[in-house]
Amino acid sequence: MNAGTNAAGKVLVANRGEIAIRVFRTLRALGIGSVAVFTDADAGARHVREADEATRIPSYLDIDAVIGAARATGAGAVHPGYGFLAENAAFARACAGAGLVFIGPPATAIEAMGDKIRAKQTVAAAGVPVVPGRDEAGLSDDELAAAALDVGLPVLLKPSAGGGGKGMRLVQDAADLPDAIASARREARASFGDDTLLVERFVTNPRHIEIQVFADAHGHAVHLGERECSLQRRHQKIIEEAPSPLLDEATRQRMGASAVAAAKAVGYVGAGTVEYIVSADRPGEYFFMEMNTRLQVEHPVTELVTGLDLVELQLRVAAGEPLPFSQDDVVLRGHSVEARVYAEDPARGFLPTGGRVLALSEPSGDHVRVDSGLDTGTEVGGSYDPMLAKVIVWGADRAEALRRLDRALGSYTLLGVGTNVAFLRALLRHPDVEAGRLDTGLVERSLDELTGEAAVPDEVFAAAALERMLALETGDPDPWAIPDGWRPGTPARTPWIITPSGGDPVEVSVRGRAHDAEVTVGTTRTADGEDAANGEGAAGSESAAGSESAAGVPVRASLRAEGPGLSLTYGGRTASYRAAREGHTLWLGRGGHTWALTEHVRAEGGAAAAVAGDGVLRSPMPGTVLAVKVAEGDQVDEGQPLVVVEAMKMEHTVTAPIAGVVARLPVRAGAQVALDAVLAVIEAEEG
C-alpha cells in the first residue's frame, strides 16, 4: 500500500476486543502503525497489548475523547470497527472536522441508512423491494398499535435508529402490543438513545440473507456475494455462512444488483452490508430490511470465499484509491461458516454470563481461523456485548465446512466463563442445519432439543468429587490422614455436596482414594446439606458405614492429574478434561462443554430456601438492577414481576416464585448483582 493511504502512517481503532485485534492484524501486515483506546475496565485487555500504542478514554462512545486520542498519538485516520461509534454520523463529521480520515462511508450515507424509516424510503425510490409496513417518524404508542393492526399480525417492531436485534419485538397477538411497544422503546432508548419505532409485516419462515457491497469514491460499486445469517437467537446471529445454501446464481445476481443500487442511492463509499429478508417458501422474493454502514461481525466468511481482505479494501478506499477489481472479477470459491462464541447460557434463555478466563485453548489448523479478544485472565463483565470470539472455517463444500467447524468447536476450551460452544455444536448437527433448511425461527423451535445435553453428566460430578479427594491426599501412610472414609473394621464413604452453576446441589459419595474409588452420584440436596430422604450431613462429613444415596448406583472410578487437566476413568471409560479452580469452584471442560462445580458451603438464613424451591428470588445473570417493582411488606402473587435485571443492554424480568409477602428486599435500582444473588425473599402466608 502506498504512503498516501495514511499520511501519518498510523490508524487509531475506536473499538475493543476481537474487532480491534482484527484491524490491527491488517495494519501490521501493511506496515501501518496502530493505536488502541481503552477504558478503565479494559486496561489489561488483549487489544491494548496488541496495538503499537494505546491511550485511555473514559468511554468508547465519547467522541471528543476519541478525537483527542487520535490527535495526541499522531494518528491520521480512525477505524471505527463495528458497534459503538461505527454508525454515528456525528462521529464521522467530527473526524473530518479534525482533519482525520474516517475509514467508513460519508456521514450523509450513515444518516440516510442509519434511520430505518428514511432508508426504506430511499431504497424504495431506487427500485429496491421493501417489506410492507408503516415507517413514519414520530408515531405514538397508540398509532404504532393501530399501524400494526393495519399491516396485519404478526408484525415486527423495530427501532429506527439501530440494529443488531436490540429493541426488536415480534408481536403475534394484539393484546401483547402495549407491553411490546413499551419494552421495545425502552431497549431502543438504552441501546441507541432514540426510542423511535417502525412496524413491519413479519414474513413467515423468514431467512436472513445479506449482501456485502463495496464502493469507492470514483463511482464504482460491486457486491461480493451473500451471507446466510438465518441461524439466530433473540434476533441476533450466531452462525453465518457464505454462500447461502438457498440461492441459485440468478437470484444471487439479482439481489447483488439490488444491493448495489441501494448503495448508490445514498452515495455510498466503503464497506457496507444490505440485509434482506427472504421467505424460505419463496426464495425468489426478497425484501430490503436495512443497510449496515460498517464492517459486519461476519465479514470473515466473505473473506474466505473471495480471498479478499476487507479491512485492507476499507483502508484503500478511504485513502481515495479506486477498487482494484470489477464485478466480473469477483469469484466465490468453496464454502465458509462462522460461529460466534458468546458469554451466555443457552439452557437459561441465553442469559449473559461473566467471570474471569481461567484457562483458554482456541482451535487451530488448516482452514480454521479464530478472531478473538480473549486471553487467560481476561475479565468478562456486563458492560459490553457478550460476544467473545468467532471461529471461522473454510471447506471445499458446505458439508466439509460444517464438519470442520464442528471439530474446531470441539477443541475450544474456555474455563471461568460460561459460553454457548456446546450449544453451537448441537446446532451444527441439527438435521435441518445439515440439510440447509434454515429460517430465523429454527433455533427457538428446536431449543429444548438443542439444550438437552445441558444436564451435568454423572461422570462430571464424579470428577469434581475425586478432584477434591486428590487435592487432599498427602502421601501420609497413616490411614487416619487419608480422606478415604477409612474407619477401623468397616468401610465408609466421604460425601461431597457439589453444586453446578445455576443448578441444585447434588451429593457425591466416594469410598476409597482418588486413584481407586467407588463413586455414587446421589440425590439433590437442600442448601444446608440435608437430604430429605435420609437426613445426612454436609459436605466432607463422615456418614454411617454402608449407607448409599437412594438415587445413585456405585461406579468404579479413578482420577489422576494430567498436565493442565484431569484423566478420569468412570465405569470403564476414560476421558480427559481441562481443569481450572477458582476458590471453591472447579471448572471442567471437554469437547466444547464446560461445567462449573462448586463445593458446598453451608448457606445461612433464607439462602437455603432457594434450593428447596421456596420464596427466594435469585438473579438469573450477573448485571445491574434496573427496576424494583415492590417494597418490603407488599403482598405479591405467584408470577408477579418484582425485579428487572439488565446485562449487556438486555433486560430480564424476575417474577415471584410463590404468592406471599415480601419479607426481604436486599437490592435497589442501580445495584450490581452476581449470578444467583438474592434479590428478594417471599414468605408464604400461613393457611
Language-model segment annotations:
Residues 9, 166, 243, 385-391, ...:
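Short amphipathic alpha-helical segments
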Residues 173, 215-220, 278-283, 364, ...:
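Short acidic-glycine loop/turn motifs at beta-strand connectors
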Residues 259, 300-303, 308-550, 641, ...:
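Catalytic cores of soluble metabolic enzymes centered on carboxylation/carboxyl-transfer
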Residues 574, 578-619:
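Catalytic P-loop NTP-binding/switch module of NTPases
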